[in-house]
Amino acid sequence: MELLNKKILVVGLARTGVAVARFLAARGARVTVTDMKDEAALAPLMEQLADLDIDYELGRHERHSFLMADLVVVSPGVPMDIKPLLLAKAQRRTVISEIELAARFLTAPLVAITGTNGKTTTTTLTGEIFAACGFKTFVGGNIGNPLIELVTSGEAVDRVVVELSSFQLEGIIDFRPQVAVLLNITEDHLDRYATYQEYIDAKLRIFENQTSADYAVLNMDDPLVAAYAGKMKARVVPTSQRQELAQGIFYRNGSIVYRWEGREELFATASFRLKGVHNIDNIMAALASTLLMGCDAGQALAALEAFAGLPHRMEFVREVNGVAWYEDSKGTNVGSVVKSLESFDSGITLIAGGKDKGGEYTPLAGLVKERVGHLILIGEAKERMCNALGSLTDTHLADTLEDAVALAHRLTSPGGVVLFSPACSSFDMFKNYEERGECFKSLVRSLDDGAGR
């Protein structure tokens, strides 16, 4: 792909925009960056590009900038349906995501992972297994480093593993992973998509350019994912916790069984540090991806036994007076919370709520009624959540996370579990889910072991 002297517009600065602008400028492109934020807000990011000849259009998006560009590269946080982008597409301007741009310069085999929940854990674990098997591996995309940074560095790697959001997949054209993974699909980001089907269609684009030489790893326990299995051009590698498979990867009697083209490997899960029923799905997807791409089963098992998981995902904080406290701030949608609740049989005090993302809370109803003894709701969404779930168990509304933790401490009996799994984003009360999770853990760590109930 020739970039020298091409007029290229980068839409949205942030970390990815900086990485894209630096790469393009280094290749001799004539780069303009446009962002709706003003110079004062973007000054720290612009400082990172101060040594480069880049034009800026800030606080606005000018129509002519989009129409005059040879190529438009869109950062993940920018909706693809803003008017200037729609206009550019209508005028046959090439509009792509950073992932599409980077992939055009990659030569190493690529594993791409998407889904509503579990992406980051699966992506990280896949990278860990490849590394344990001796492959020099880049892990990035929607987590960590933008993929374009690998291309910029010129570093030679053996394997590339990327987490992809629906937003990144909206901007692909030729992107083709050798292994594409779809973990699950549940309602999410309905504050950005007009319909649920639009969100589903964006996720499915990960398979769009695959051929029969590639692999599509699909969670067949998810009805929505399974419904699209017959439409794949790639070879389908099914995963399941519920059924034994003639070919694929499945869970049976405390072990994960990988069975593919005459090869069979067994992985006893008792030695895994990563716990939770939902993590079996993530582990199976990571194993399938790596074993298909040349990994040794023994080395893969060693990586699994060493991997403890990631912060803010069903993270055990501490036990206080016989009550176990878990922080799951990354549980930002209903599907994620369902999986977290399924990890415990009963005696749960659930703290949930935050910024409403527009989905339905009723899929939680059965588990709340069956397993949740106390429901404590916070944030912007608490009233709507209360309307959907409040009649099913003992329900309380709290003004702050601090109040919710104190209330959970008083209400939960020894032997019970307090689970903070919001089913909402954090932006009504916190900067991001990480800050929210750290706040929760700090509050739990400050609880008095000897406090009365």
From Swiss-Prot:
It is found in: Cytoplasm. Pathway: Cell wall biogenesis; peptidoglycan biosynthesis. Belongs to the MurCDEF family. SUPFAM superfamilies: MurCD N-terminal domain, MurD-like peptide ligases, catalytic domain, MurD-like peptide ligases, peptide-binding domain. GO terms for molecular function: ATP binding; UDP-N-acetylmuramoylalanine-D-glutamate ligase activity. Cell wall formation. Catalyzes the addition of glutamate to the nucleotide precursor UDP-N-acetylmuramoyl-L-alanine (UMA). It comes from the Bacteria. NCBIfam families: murD. This is UDP-N-acetylmuramoylalanine--D-glutamate ligase. Its EC number is 6.3.2.9. It catalyses: UDP-N-acetyl-alpha-D-muramoyl-L-alanine + D-glutamate + ATP = UDP-N-acetyl-alpha-D-muramoyl-L-alanyl-D-glutamate + ADP + phosphate + H(+). ATP binds at residues 115-121. It is an enzyme of class 6 (ligase). GO terms for cellular component: cytoplasm. GO terms for biological process: cell division; cell wall organization; peptidoglycan biosynthetic process; regulation of cell shape. PANTHER family: UDP-N-ACETYLMURAMOYLALANINE--D-GLUTAMATE LIGASE (PTHR43692:SF1). InterPro entries: Mur-like_cat_sf, Mur_ligase_C, Mur_ligase_C_dom_sf, Mur_ligase_cen, MurD. Keywords: ATP-binding, Cell cycle, Cell division, Cell shape, Cell wall biogenesis/degradation, Cytoplasm, Ligase, Nucleotide-binding, Peptidoglycan synthesis.
